[in-house]
Amino acid sequence: MSKQMQTPCKELVLDKILEKPTTFMKLVSECQCATETVEKYLSIYIEKNSIKQKKGKFRVLYSPELEEEVIEFYELLLNPTTKAILLVLLKSNLALSQIELVATIEKSNPSISRGLKVLLEKRWIKRNYHAPFSTYQISNKTKLFEMLEKTYPKIATNFEQFDLCYPKPRIFLDIYQ
């Protein structure tokens, strides 16, 4: 392979990671370079401390300037249900019940329950108890939105276009009033 072809790939790998955190497979896909080539450049950048990596369920690559909490946030949002819960609660002006989240996100009750549990453990959401149900809301919207801007800039930029109009989940709670 010519040096001319290697250079763009090498620079692209670094640029993508410094721009925002990413997973290894997403990086390979976005750079459109061979897996082995990306791996080679990653090892060079990690050795130089130009980038960092965190291995877990996914191999996350990120800028050394990002705080650990932002990386945890990114990892958490790799789960589509957790991401959906967080986005719906960020957008909502009201605290929502689990039933409302199930109706809005169209995921199963156990999936929503698991996502809520993880978000509660991280203290990114808080639970409000009302007999016979609980509602959930974001603990610190400003802080979470700042982390969203660092990890998912496209979502943060287009956040105002995200609409919660459908379905109207409030009908599920009318029986308790």
Where are these regions (language model features)?
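Short amphipathic alpha-helical interaction segments
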Residues: C33-I44, E106-E121
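Long, low-complexity, charge-rich intrinsically disordered regions
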Residues: M1-K16, Y62-L66, F73-V88, S92, ...
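Long, low-complexity, charged/polar intrinsically disordered regions in eukaryotic proteins
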Residues: M1, M25, S29-I71
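Residue-level recognition of short, well-ordered coil/turn positions
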Residues: P21, S50, N93-L94, W124
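Short acidic, hydrophobic short linear motifs in intrinsically disordered regions
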Residues: E19-C31, L94-I105
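A generic structural signal for beta-strand entry/edge sites
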Residues: P21, K57-R59, F133-T135
